[in-house]
């Protein structure tokens, strides 16, 4: 699924350099997954070992924020640039979609639209969560653990439930082709089915742990992921076919950059969505446009 950006502004890159930038790597993909899931399991284990103490609260908060950064895994595997292997891209795409409460069919199509109409109001870019005018209560609730419960009717979980019971939502109607909608509903039912199994397990074992590990992290550990996401397009121009005005590149420390899988180079990503994230810093170097530094939206 290639995104047609012919009508968008694109900075020039030498063809040979661009070819090298687009090279995928199974090694880079597995390295990232090993460190990510290794860190997740480590803090999950520490939370379990200290269960019942205040240390458990701290470790679960860290676990939840790492877990919620599965958004970056979903994104990179969705672009099929995390691995050279199609199988491993699809395998981790399904896992990270569940972790992120993203129904995989809906989000593949809405992300395709996001790249074709970035920050547009018409046709609506459904991936822009914070729009103007901003609902301040909703905005600040995104940063507070369990604040999202106040707006559960707007949550991705509620959207998945609607799809699972056969309701055609606005995003389904505008983004997903008719022939793909049954796939969306079926995968939504799988997600809801897993949620039910986890909830029933918590009830049977009389323990919050299954839910704290698999369902609730996006409610109590979403702070970092929301902060990362806000750097992309919030407060910038809408309805303009130039990513330099609608998208933002920022600079992060190495830990945050890893968790975000280098999507802080977001202008570069939108201009060249086929470049794997591990090469995005190089794409910044290779872009050869004299006026670029003056024109581009950096922070």
Where are these regions (language model features)?
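Histidine-centered catalytic micro-motifs
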Residues: 70-79, 107-119, 228-235, 259-275
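Short, surface-exposed loop/helix-turn segments at secondary-structure junctions
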Residues: 240-247
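Hydrophobic alpha-helical segments, chiefly the membrane-spanning helices
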Residues: 296-299
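Membrane-embedded alpha-helical segments that form the functional core of polytopic membrane enzymes
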Residues: 50-73, 91, 95-105, 218, ...
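Non-catalytic, topology-defining segments of multipass membrane proteins
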Residues: 1-63, 98-211, 278-288, 292
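Aspartate-rich (DDxxD/NDxxD/DxxxD) Mg2+/diphosphate-binding motifs
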Residues: 73-91, 119-129
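Post-HEXXH active-site segment of zinc metalloproteases
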Residues: 85-97, 281-284
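Transmembrane alpha-helical segments that form the membrane-embedded catalytic/substrate-channel core
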Residues: 64-74, 103, 107, 152-155, ...
């Amino acid at each position: 699924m290639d995104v047609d950006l012919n009508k968008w502004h694109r900075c020039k890159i030498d063809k040979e350099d661009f070819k090298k930038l687009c090279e995928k790597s199974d090694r880079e993909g597995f390295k990232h997954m090993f460190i990510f899931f290794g860190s997740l399991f480590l803090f999950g284990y520490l939370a379990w070992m200290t269960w019942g103490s205040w240390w458990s609260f701290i470790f679960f908060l860290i676990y939840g924020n790492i877990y919620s950064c599965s958004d970056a895994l979903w994104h990179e595997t969705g672009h099929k640039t995390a691995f050279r292997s199609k199988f491993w891209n699809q395998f981790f795409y399904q896992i990270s979609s569940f972790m992120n409460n993203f129904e995989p069919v809906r989000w593949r199509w809405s992300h395709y639209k996001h790249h074709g109409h970035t920050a547009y109001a018409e046709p609506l870019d459904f991936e822009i969560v914070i729009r103007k005018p901003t609902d301040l209560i909703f905005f600040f609730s995104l940063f507070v653990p369990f604040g999202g419960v106040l707006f559960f009717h707007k949550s991705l979980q509620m959207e998945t439930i609607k799809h699972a019971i056969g309701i055609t939502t606005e995003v389904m109607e505008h983004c997903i082709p008719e022939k793909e909608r049954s796939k969306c509903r079926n995968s939504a039912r799988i997600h809801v089915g897993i949620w039910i199994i986890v909830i029933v397990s918590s009830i049977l074992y009389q323990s919050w742990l299954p839910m704290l590990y698999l369902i609730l992290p996006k409610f109590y550990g979403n702070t970092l992921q929301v902060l990362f996401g806000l750097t992309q397009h919030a407060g910038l121009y809408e309805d303009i076919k130039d990513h330099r005005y609608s998208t933002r590149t920022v600079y992060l420390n190495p830990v945050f950059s890893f968790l975000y899988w280098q999507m802080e180079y977001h202008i570069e990503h939108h201009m060249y969505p086929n470049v794997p994230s591990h090469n995005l810093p190089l794409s910044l170097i290779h872009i050869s446009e004299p006026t670029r530094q003056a024109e581009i939206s950096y922070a």
